[in-house]
């Protein structure tokens, strides 16, 4: 009340031209008098900093923030941090204005203010939002030099950079900062490759050879694991890592030596006379190089014919995944000039040599494409898939032209085979030309198989293409949007399913809620193929976020449509392989008792994935689940579909001698295109069973190694809990023994205790890594102990 009484004095001072005195009085009581003197502001003529600051405060109280900011800027050096509510608020309003863009004076003031602040996540986020890359670069350097873990922050910046179409600027900034310590140096390597500056990677590796050989090994391993570059350096130790020979050698030896596969258990499966014994054997011995069962039971496997035999021979490639001499292994199956033999052997060759870009192997496979007259469907598939696997993601124009020629023949299966090969070659290439070729093939055929293969290839080519949807400077981004939109609204249900799958592939691992909301309505599409594709696509988008994946798909596990329930089961299992996730194991166990055979099959496969390297201590219902799978294998009353699911699920649960999981992340923990391709192809096994072997592209050995400067074995000891025992639950008896025959007792459960200390080459499960704090890739390079 006392303050209100001074209003007449303020007005009198203003009207008498005594502005300075009036401003002093207003400043002392601005919060109260401001609403009452807004009509008297016209008497203020001065524009000096003191008056401007007072006017800013008045307009701030009046909530005219635009005017408040304008006068605050005119106040110049008088606008200082006095701890007042006004100062804090006006700065926040300026930050909002700078974020929107416009007045450079606001931006300069904000940058001046925040330049004096301590660097934290929120400051870096704000600098990114206003595109202040210069200050952002300085802030990042300080943030990292303070010893902060930058991984989560940089991952977020890169994700936002993709979404806002400024990824080039983000990576350019990281490249300018240059390599430092781990883990920042790996982001700089990503930047060099994104900017297509491989020479800088080579120069960095050559410098580290002289300065820090242990860090050099880390960099070389990361580079090979993620980019498989054609970099040559003089140091043979580093070169062995860059070529991939080092990784293949240590992983192959690990899987061979630590193989826990029980051949008695495999023999018990053989006694059930299942048609899928070869599949179970290949999964259980994946990467171990142990094909004893094949060699000892050649008569059983020799009875298969046509596509069944193709699948069995192709799956040999899974067993010898890390073998360095595939021609010796496959010599009895590989075709030659005088004998067509097995096309599956060519696919096996591709699985073993996947991603090597071997010219010798490519030339060998291309020979068969020149024999079109004698080219059988089995051989064509072997050639095309083999070429696609070996040259995956290379976009080799010569090979693509050969496959394009094959796609023009009037033989449906050969066209389908060529399309698969084209998609694998174009993996993650974002090639508009290749997309046009595939669209032409789809438009010229009426066969569902070919159209479906085109859709899978579309999804492979568009993989990880999210940034192209936001990059307005790139002319191709409109093409991508048009391709997918045309497919999403196509009258042909298969093409619609192809569009759904391609959208999920383009945004793989991003967790974009907008994309998920676009995909969810297709769950209610009138066609089952579209429903299934929608679930797979949602799984792809969410595959890097467990909570989002489970939260989105869990409600769909109770969907009225059995195709949706079936797809949910496989997708949850594959993307959470080896985690023993309790929520998902409960979902999948319930689906094992579904009324529909396809759902039960898919649930069996899903639990096979999710229970890998688990036991009853990690998963409470583990025994009940595995015993159910075992009963389904021996129960002859079950349908063939459920039998396939049970055998496949059991093979997966014992996969790789219990030393692997299946993951879309590589050893460095990065979601990689080739592994996503393996997942996409495997998830379409329902349409063509030989695609089951593609799951081997996702195989991830789980171990821990330690090497010194000479790449020699270095002993380590990492304490771990005793919760990771291996439990093998055997199959129940197929039939009861006669009373007068004494049947020898056999243990139905075999336990192999896990060590309490992890040493060099020990199995180290996903859960153990989390428990022991071991970062990917679990290959340590340390100084030699004296």
From Swiss-Prot:
Family: Belongs to the proteasome subunit S1 family.
Record localization: Cytoplasm; Nucleus
Major localization class: cytoplasm
Organism for this UniProt entry: Encephalitozoon cuniculi (strain GB-M1) (Microsporidian parasite)
Subunit structure: The 26S proteasome consists of a 20S proteasome core and two 19S regulatory subunits. The 20S proteasome core is composed of 28 subunits that are arranged in four stacked rings, resulting in a barrel-shaped structure. The two end rings are each formed by seven alpha subunits, and the two central rings are each formed by seven beta subunits. The catalytic chamber with the active sites is on the inside of the barrel.
Per-repeat ranges for PC: 311-343, 344-377, 382-416, 417-451, 498-532, 533-566, 567-601
Domain of life from the UniProt record: Eukaryota
Gene: RPN2
Summary of the function given for this chain in its UniProt record: Acts as a regulatory subunit of the 26S proteasome which degrades poly-ubiquitinated proteins in the cytoplasm and in the nucleus. It is essential for the regulated turnover of proteins and for the removal of misfolded proteins. The proteasome is a multicatalytic proteinase complex that is characterized by its ability to cleave peptides with Arg, Phe, Tyr, Leu, and Glu adjacent to the leaving group at neutral or slightly basic pH.
Protein name: 26S proteasome regulatory subunit RPN2
Keyword terms of this UniProt record: Cytoplasm, Nucleus, Proteasome, Repeat
Gene3D superfamilies: Leucine-rich Repeat Variant (1.25.10.10)
């Amino acid at each position: 009340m006392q303050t209100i009484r001074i209003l007449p004095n303020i007005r009198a001072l203003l009207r008498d031209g005594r502005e300075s005195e009036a401003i002093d009085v207003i400043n002392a009581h601005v919060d109260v008098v401001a609403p009452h003197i807004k009509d008297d502001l016209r008497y203020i003529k001065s524009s000096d900093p003191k008056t401007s600051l007072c006017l800013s405060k008045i307009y701030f109280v009046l909530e005219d923030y635009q005017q408040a900011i304008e006068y605050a800027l005119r106040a110049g050096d008088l606008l200082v941090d006095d701890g007042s509510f006004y100062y804090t608020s006006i700065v926040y309003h300026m930050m909002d204005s700078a974020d929107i863009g416009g007045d450079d004076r606001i931006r300069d003031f904000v940058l001046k203010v925040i330049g004096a602040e301590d660097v934290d996540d929120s400051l870096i986020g704000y600098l990114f939002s206003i595109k202040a890359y210069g200050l952002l670069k300085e802030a990042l350097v300080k943030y990292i030099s303070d010893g902060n873990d930058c991984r989560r922050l940089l991952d977020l910046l890169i994700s936002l950079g993709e979404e806002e179409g400024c990824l080039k600027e983000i990576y350019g900034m990281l490249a300018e900062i240059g390599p430092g310590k781990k883990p920042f140096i790996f982001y700089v390597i990503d930047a060099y490759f994104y900017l297509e500056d491989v020479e800088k990677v080579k120069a960095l590796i050559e410098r580290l050879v002289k300065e820090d050989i242990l860090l050099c090994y880390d960099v070389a391993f990361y580079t090979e694991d993620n980019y498989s570059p054609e970099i040559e350096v003089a140091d043979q130790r580093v070169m062995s890592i860059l070529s991939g020979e080092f990784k293949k050698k240590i992983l192959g030896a690990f899987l061979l030596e630590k193989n826990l596969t029980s051949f008695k258990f495999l023999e018990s499966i053989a006694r059930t006379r299942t048609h899928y014994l070869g599949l179970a054997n290949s999964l259980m011995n994946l990467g171990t190089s142990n094909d004893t069962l094949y060699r000892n039971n050649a008569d059983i496997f020799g009875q298969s014919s046509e596509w069944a035999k193709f699948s069995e021979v192709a799956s040999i490639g899974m067993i010898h995944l890390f073998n360095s001499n595939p021609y010796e292994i496959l010599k009895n199956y590989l075709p030659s000039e005088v004998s067509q033999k097995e096309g599956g052997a060519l696919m096996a060759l591709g699985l073993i040599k996947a991603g090597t870009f071997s010219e010798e192997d490519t030339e060998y496979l291309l020979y068969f494409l020149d024999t079109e007259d004698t080219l059988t469907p089995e051989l064509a598939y072997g050639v095309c898939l083999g070429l696609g696997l070996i040259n995956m993601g290379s976009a080799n124009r010569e090979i693509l032209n050969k496959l394009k020629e094959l796609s023009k023949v009037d033989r449906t299966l050969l066209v389908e085979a060529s399309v698969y090969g084209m998609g694998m070659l174009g993996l993650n290439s974002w090639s508009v030309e290749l997309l046009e070729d595939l669209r032409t093939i789809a438009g010229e055929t009426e066969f569902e198989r070919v159209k479906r293969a085109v859709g899978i290839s579309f999804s492979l080519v568009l993989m990880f293409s999210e940034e192209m949807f936001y990059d307005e400077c790139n002319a191709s981004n409109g093409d991508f949007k048009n391709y997918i939109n045309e497919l999403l609204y196509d009258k042909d249900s298969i093409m619609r399913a192809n569009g759904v799958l391609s959208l999920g592939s383009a945004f793989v691992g991003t967790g974009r809620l907008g994309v998920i909301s676009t995909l969810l309505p297709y769950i209610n599409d009138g066609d089952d193929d579209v429903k299934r594709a929608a679930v797979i696509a949602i799984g792809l988008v969410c595959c890097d976020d467990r909570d989002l994946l489970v939260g989105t798909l869990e409600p769909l596990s109770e969907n009225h449509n059995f195709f949706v329930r079936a797809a949910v089961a496989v997708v949850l299992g594959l993307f959470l392989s080896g985690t023993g996730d309790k929520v998902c194991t409960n979902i999948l166990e319930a689906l094992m008792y579904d009324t529909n055979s396809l759902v039960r099959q898919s649930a069996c496969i899903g639990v096979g994935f999710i229970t890998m390297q688990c036991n009853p201590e990690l998963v409470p219902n583990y025994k009940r689940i595995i015993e159910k799978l075992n009963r389904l294998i021996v129960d002859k009353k079950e349908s063939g579909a459920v039998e396939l699911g049970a055998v496949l699920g059991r093979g997966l649960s014992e996969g790789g001698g219990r030393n692997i999981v299946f993951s879309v992340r590589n050893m460095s923990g990065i979601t990689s295109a080739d592994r996503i391709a393996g997942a996409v192809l495997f998830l379409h096994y329902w349409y063509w069973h030989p695609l089951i072997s593609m799951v081997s592209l996702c195989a991830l050995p789980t171990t821990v190694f330690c090497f010194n400067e000479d790449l020699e074995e270095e002993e380590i000891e990492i304490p771990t809990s005793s919760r990771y025992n291996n439990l093998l639950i055997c199959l129940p008896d197929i039939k009861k023994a006669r009373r007068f025959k004494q049947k020898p007792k056999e243990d139905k459960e075999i336990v192999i205790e896990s060590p309490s200390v992890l040493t060099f080459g020990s199995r180290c499960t996903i859960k153990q890594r989390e428990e022991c704090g071991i970062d990917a890739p679990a290959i340590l390079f340390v100084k030699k102990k004296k």
